[in-house]
Amino acid sequence: MKNKSFAVIGLGQFGMTLAVTLAESDCDVLAIDDKEENIEEISEKVTYAVKADVREPGILKALGVQNVDVAIIAVAENLEASISATMQAKDLGVPFVVAKSMNSLHGRILDKIGADKIIYPEQAMGLRVARNLLSGGYLDVFELSAEFSMAEFSIPESWVGKSLIDLNVRERFHINIIGIKQGENVTVDLKPSEPLPDQIGRAHV
């Protein structure tokens, strides 16, 4: 069976990790970035690594991106490059185009120009952290927008007796605790310096 082939465009932390992981899973990976140091770092880890500016018209065709099964556009921080690469991949007939987005407006633009799947890695990371933080488990999530979600989870024993300042969840996990539920009562006026009592059941973030 033919190995599945991917083009990963943009080798920031997200793109670099994705490209290497796919290559380690025996996929054929074409990695593209405009920084020589990124190409040098990944060149021996993927099938092909090429330095190119994806804002240049026709560059993806010249690099053979039309031959891959999936193109992943991971250059969200540069809006022009993100749009250009997504449009080129779609025009080339790549079967499935995944585009990384930084916010809901960016996501709507990518949707309009035909991206098959739009991902928000920072949001996804926050949700994964919330799911895996606690032995009691992740209970529910409400998507408020492409950028924000609200989740409910059980408080782990390791948090009992510590204050929100001690836990520093905003810096460590990129979440904000907005309320604490005890029985049927929900407290939203939280005092960051007060330790969490042992009878707390759930937190909302």
Listing of model-derived features with the role each one plays in the protein:
Residues 2, 9, 32, 157-204:
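Cytosolic Rossmann-like ligand/nucleotide-binding regulatory domains
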Residues 7-8, 73:
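Hydrophobic Val/Ile/Leu positions in short beta-strands of Rossmann-like dinucleotide-binding domains
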Residues 15-16:
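N-terminal Rossmann-fold NAD(P) dinucleotide-binding loop
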Residues 22:
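Aromatic pocket-lining residues of Rossmann-like dinucleotide-binding sites
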Residues 32-34, 101:
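Conserved acidic E/D residue at the C-terminus of a beta-strand in Rossmann-like folds
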Residues 40, 45-129, 154:
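Phosphate-bearing ligand-interacting subdomains
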Residues 127-145, 158:
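A charged, well-structured terminal subsegment
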